[in-house]
Amino acid sequence: ELQVDYIDYLLLHGVGMGGMEEIEGRFMNNGILDHLLEERQKGRIRNLGFSFHGDVKIFDYLLSLHDAGKYTWDFVQIQLNYVDWRHAQEEHARNINAEYLYGELAKRNIPSVIMEPLLGGRLANVHAHIAAILKQRRPDLSIASWAFRFAGTHPMVLSVLSGMPYME
């Protein structure tokens, strides 16, 4: 029992990693997604979305259902940072370029929630020559702040999640 009248944002987590069978088994064939949509219709869920990880066919399929009006999404959580914008597959073969993911959502006016803006902390600790270029331009800014600003400056970004255990 949550003991609240409504949920502001409900997220289906980890969508896309296990293929079509998993998405259908976890959310569709068992009626869970239909139930969540009913709860949204009743006002008990204000915003329904999913976090995307993995197979772009699943992402495109869920957006096609949105386009058809069957399952509409209020937001989608995606991995977006200045490396993954155009070079996601260089990091991991299953990753999809954030430019594509964000662009498809923006075309549909679906806000994005951003995960991994620092790419697991690696963008806060860049190579010295890159850090020097950034510091030369704006010495007052931290290296991590460049990554956060990149992630947050796109107009359809709802929120940028830090995922950091320490402020440093």
Predicted feature locations:
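Active-site gating/metal-coordination segments in enzymes
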Residues: E1-M17
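Beta/alpha (TIM)-barrel catalytic core signal, keyed to glycine-rich beta->alpha loops juxtaposed to Asp/Glu
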Residues: L12-E168
